[in-house]
């Protein structure tokens, strides 16, 4: 770590930048796999590079946060800001996501339990296969689910701030006052959906690796992930 400081004991920002440039590509590749093919890797790299520059410029070691942790927050935050500014999620996808969440909420209230895929599909008036495709189409928009939550419930619920960006919407919720409510909601999910969230967000397995654990394909994992997040939003939205 000494190579990151000048002879005067001042942090060498250029050396810090050079050492952590590979982190930008790592985070960009991790994010790209969750996005439509239309999102270019170069755009993510450029935004992430700006995030790293901001991290280098604003990092204060005296605050006690490791630079890697701080840099990852800045890099990911910059990439997500870039995606939000482009509003890449089609309106039809957002509409479908809302309709699925609404159907789930209505059924859960009526049944007193988690609704099955067949029940949700019937409520929407579509075949199960079409419902599963809808889950696939809407899964990518889950990156911004916490933004939609904030819009629905107001700024009094601080899920995301510039200084405290986290890596995913689930972690955003777990860092706030909603932690216990989120944990209770997760525990009420179907077992396979709980497992998907645990493997994806805590163990950081990718879709292919989770598929191997569950003995299903990547598309099925994506569907389960999408369905789990929608259930969480529905459960939390009632409270």
Curated annotation (Swiss-Prot):
It holds the Pfam family Sigma70_r4. Residues 185-233 are annotated as: Sigma-70 factor domain-4. One of its GO terms (biological process) is regulation of DNA-templated transcription. Residues 207-226 bind DNA. PROSITE patterns: SIGMA70_1 (PS00715), SIGMA70_2 (PS00716). The keyword Signal does not apply. GO terms for molecular function: DNA binding; DNA-directed RNA polymerase activity; sigma factor activity. InterPro entries: RNA_pol_sigma-70_dom, RNA_pol_sigma70, RNA_pol_sigma70_r2, RNA_pol_sigma70_r3, RNA_pol_sigma70_r4, RNA_pol_sigma_FliA_WhiG, RNA_pol_sigma_r2, RNA_pol_sigma_r3/r4-like. Residues 16-88 are annotated as: Sigma-70 factor domain-2. A motif (Interaction with polymerase core subunit RpoC) lies at residues 43-46. Residues 96-166 are annotated as: Sigma-70 factor domain-3. It is found in: Cytoplasm. Gene3D superfamilies: 1.10.1740.10, 1.20.140.160. One of its GO terms (cellular component) is cytoplasm. Sigma factors are initiation factors that promote the attachment of RNA polymerase to specific initiation sites and are then released. This sigma factor controls the expression of flagella-related genes. May regulate the expression of genes involved in virulence. Belongs to the sigma-70 factor family. FliA subfamily. This is RNA polymerase sigma factor FliA. It comes from Salmonella typhimurium (strain LT2 / SGSC1412 / ATCC 700720). The lineage of its organism: Bacteria, Pseudomonadati, Pseudomonadota, Gammaproteobacteria, Enterobacterales.
